[in-house]
Every structure is written in C-alpha cells, then in structure tokens.
Amino acid sequence: AHIWLTDDNGSPLIGEYSMPTRLGSTELKSFNHSVWIPTDHNTGKLTGTRLHVPIRFEKEIDRLTPYLFRAVCQGRVLKEAVIKMYKINEAGIEVEYFNIILENVKITQISPVLFPVGIASKHMEEVEIRYESIEWKYTDGNIMFKDSWNERVIA
C-alpha cells in the first residue's frame, strides 16, 4: 500500500517513491484500521452508531517525517490522504485494486521505532491519523462507500 498526502493549502507533500505510477507516494509497511458498532452483549441489539478507530500505519522515516511532525505539533489539518492498495492479477501483473480516500486528516501521533539489530534494516515510524470523512473504493466496478462525521447516522 502507498499513501499520498495533501497539506492544508492543497499542495502535495512529496514522498520519496519514484516509480511512475506511484510518484511522490510513501510506501506503507503495515496498516491497521477498523470500524465497529456498539451492541448489547446479551441480545446483539445495536446500542449506538458506528465508531471509527484511528488509522495506524508504519513507514520508513523519510522526507515526509518532518512534515508529519509539524502537522501533529501545530495541530494542522491535512486536506487529503489517499491510500492505494495493489495486488498481483491473474496475468501476473501488479494492479491497483482498492483505495481509501480521507478528507480533513489529523496526524494524532508519531512514534519513531528502532528494532533490535538484525530484525529490521530500516528506521521506521508508526503514525496514527484521524479524519473527518473516509471513502472506501474497490476499483473494479467502481464500488464505493463514503462515511462522514458530519452526517448523522441513526442505528
């Protein structure tokens, strides 16, 4: 997976990836996110509306790192983050198949991570982000769903 970020002024924050189809992105080494809805443990009935857990990912420390620290330290809201996921198709070609588009993104935590010698050769960082809206898009068939905190959802 790769991420592209746009700052609060609408300018791209350029990552170090230089492959033409991923130019300016940053590779995500790990990614974790979930959405859940509260339910009664005995009956299974819904007791509230959906809740989004912050997105957490791990990436190599790179040219984006100071921009991410600036965003968290100054409370800046990034205009957009786009995460694109890839897979190998039946013909053996790598293709983009899933996107996550986030709007009004807040960097809420950055933690540099240094692994013991021999476990990883790169210096890494864990990043946590929150957002105002999220859209999930499966590219084959253009199947998508968008959720926004500004829209009231009744369970």
List where the protein language model places each region.
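Glycine-rich, low-complexity intrinsically disordered segments
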Residues: 1-155
